[in-house]
Amino acid sequence: MRALYPGSFDPLTNGHMDLIERAVSLFGEVVVAVLSNPSKRPAFSVDERIEQIRTATCHLSGVEVISFDGLTVNCAVTHRADLILRGLRAMSDFEYELQIAHTNRSLADDLETVFMATTARHSFLSSSVVKEVARFGGSIDHMVPPEVAKDLNRLFNSAFPSS
């Protein structure tokens, strides 16, 4: 099976990585689809995020990393995905994701959405939390892959040089 895992991944977290690794084991192939959303101001460009994900997943066979804009269902159809994969950290995630899953199903009735719960050790992680911790000089080494930590530290150290 081929799963599409869409998201902004700004930045990729260890929670994302855990989901990707588990999904490869379950489904065989995972297309990580990096959303290009011009209305948001990401910390990293789409190309930088793609490179971060490719570097972090290079030990996994069956992972493809792409960018997309527009509807997730169109991306899933274009890339021959059998399902859309979504991670859940809390009940509030489920309520939002279920609404999106129903919308996607109304647009492509043969496309399933599969929800995977995050592992407990990653349940607090979000890209926003990681950026906030990095912005104020906190340790993010346990939150993101090493190459992403380097990129974030470089980004925020250059944005806020010490006096």
Swiss-Prot record:
Family matches, as SUPFAM superfamilies: Nucleotidylyl transferase
InterPro entries on file: Cyt_trans-like (IPR004821), PPAT (IPR001980), Rossmann-like_a/b/a_fold (IPR014729)
Cofactor(s), by name: Mg(2+)
Family matches, as Gene3D superfamilies: HUPs
Residues that coordinate or bind ATP: 8-9, 16, 87-89, 97, 122-128
Domain of life: Bacteria
Compartment(s) of residence: Cytoplasm
Biological process terms in GO annotation: coenzyme A biosynthetic process
Pathway of action: Cofactor biosynthesis; coenzyme A biosynthesis; CoA from (R)-pantothenate: step 4/5
EC number in record: 2.7.7.3
Catalysed transformations (reactions): (R)-4'-phosphopantetheine + ATP + H(+) = 3'-dephospho-CoA + diphosphate
Family: Belongs to the bacterial CoaD family.
Oligomeric form and interacting partners: Homohexamer.
Database matches in HAMAP family: PPAT_bact
Protein name according to UniProt: Phosphopantetheine adenylyltransferase
Native source organism of the sequence: Synechococcus sp. (strain CC9605)
Underlying gene: coaD
